[in-house]
Structure formats: structure tokens, C-alpha cells
């Protein structure tokens, strides 16, 4: 399995250019946070990595490399990169139980799909009474439960990399904290490389090792989390850090 995934000069276009020459490097055991405002191109960059661009959007330049070798995005999905999506309710088939979702995921990747394996993954993400959870349909579960189930399926993939696209969006504060605890636990126990897409600098401060700031389809600043918080250079970065510090009655040094 690869130790590094590199996005090199990715450019995306629809009726007009959307993402301009984005380069990022994911490394096993490290969390790279991709931050920026809505519409900055974060989720499109993730979609390009997985080869699941929306209709009408095409990649016009760039490549993806695994340990220095060019690869097709479709060869990464599931096997090398697991995904935790922004809106879990739209990610599950409403006609299938959690057991069907989990089992199909395992079978598609050639992983064990026995009930003991599924139960262990569900228990690992803190969902109680795994036997009951496996019988539930998506509409019978809360947003927090569905997000935990999506993380359980990422665990089942046993992929060396994870893309987590706004994993705490639309969750209440308690559910957000539990999801962050889970992601932190996964990093400690399995040490995957993680691309964490978020607009919440509090999440960045807690989980990230490195940060890339995106604005208008471009990476405007990139560095380790400590440097970025203490000495942000770009206007967008300074605005993000300043807004975060203001929540705690603090100001960014000029």
C-alpha cells in the first residue's frame, strides 16, 4: 500500500475554470487540513482525487501519484482511499439496511463480510447494540449515527488514506465532538493519511498536522499547523485565524 498520495497541478473546469493548479501531498500518519470558504474548490478537489467529478466538470490538467507513480483515480477509491462524506443521509440508499451497506462495501473490496467483522467495526465507532444498528434503515437513524456508520465503513475498508469532507457539518455540538474523537482515535490506532476538508479552524487546531488554505480555486498558503496559526501570511488565512481567535476573545498579532 502507498505511503504517499500526491495531487500535482490539478486543474478543473466547467463553463469556466474552477480549480487552478492545485498541488497537495498526503502522507501516512499525518492529517492535512484543506480549509477555505464555501465555493473555494475544496470538495471539487476531493472529487477529482476520487474520480467522481460532478456532471459538466472536467479535469483539464494535472495528475495523481501514489508513491511517485501516476495512477487513475478510480484505482484509489475504497482500496487506497476511504471516504467520509459531508452529508451521510444522502450517501446511504434509503431502501437498504446498514447490514446491506456494510456487507456490500466489504465484498466490493474483497474484505471479510461476516457479521463478526461488521459488528466489530460498528462497536469501534461507539454505536451501541450493533445487531440492532445493522437492521436499521437510514431514515431510522440520526445524523450523528449515520456519520458514525460512515466512519465504520471507512474502518472496514482498511484503506491507508481517508478523505473526510466536512465530517462535522450539520451535527450538533455533542455529535461533532464525538466524531472528532473518533477521527482522532483512528489516527492514533491506524495511522492513515487523512485529507480533512473543513471551514472550522477549531477542527484544524485539534486534528491537523499540516494546513492548505484554498481561495477561488487556488492554494494560497500551505504549511504546518503551528506556523499557520502563529504567523499566517495570506489575507484569507489571516481572516480565518482571526475569526477563530475572536471566539476566545483573542486577537492575531499584527
UniProtKB/Swiss-Prot annotation:
Topological type in the membrane: Peripheral membrane protein
Key words, A-Z: ATP-binding, Cell inner membrane, Cell membrane, Ion transport, Membrane, Nickel, Nickel transport, Nucleotide-binding, Translocase, Transport
Entry keyword Transmembrane helix: no
Pfam families membership: ABC_tran
GO cellular component: plasma membrane
Gene3D superfamilies: P-loop containing nucleotide triphosphate hydrolases
PROSITE patterns linked: ABC_TRANSPORTER_1, ABC_TRANSPORTER_2, NIKD
Localization annotation: Cell inner membrane
CDD domains: ABC_NikE_OppD_transporters
Annotated ranges, domain ABC transporter: 2-241
Signal sequence region: none
Entry EC no(s): 7.2.2.11
InterPro entries referenced in this protein's UniProt entry, alphabetically: AAA+_ATPase, ABC_Ni/Peptide_Import, ABC_transporter-like_ATP-bd, ABC_transporter-like_CS, Nickel_NikD, P-loop_NTPase
Residues that, per the record, bind ATP: 36-43
GO molecular function (one): ATP hydrolysis activity
Enzyme class label: translocase
Catalytic activity: Ni(2+)(out) + ATP + H2O = Ni(2+)(in) + ADP + phosphate + H(+)
Domain of life: Bacteria
SUPFAM superfamilies xrefs: P-loop containing nucleoside triphosphate hydrolases
The protein's role, per its UniProt record: Part of the ABC transporter complex NikABCDE involved in nickel import. Responsible for energy coupling to the transport system.
Self-association and partners: The complex is composed of two ATP-binding proteins (NikD and NikE), two transmembrane proteins (NikB and NikC) and a solute-binding protein (NikA).
PANTHER family from the UniProt entry: DIPEPTIDE TRANSPORT ATP-BINDING PROTEIN DPPD, OLIGOPEPTIDE TRANSPORT ATP-BINDING PROTEIN APPD
Family indicated by similarity: Belongs to the ABC transporter superfamily. Nickel importer (TC 3.A.1.5.3) family.
Protein name (record): Nickel import ATP-binding protein NikD
Species per Swiss-Prot/TrEMBL record: Shigella boydii serotype 4 (strain Sb227)
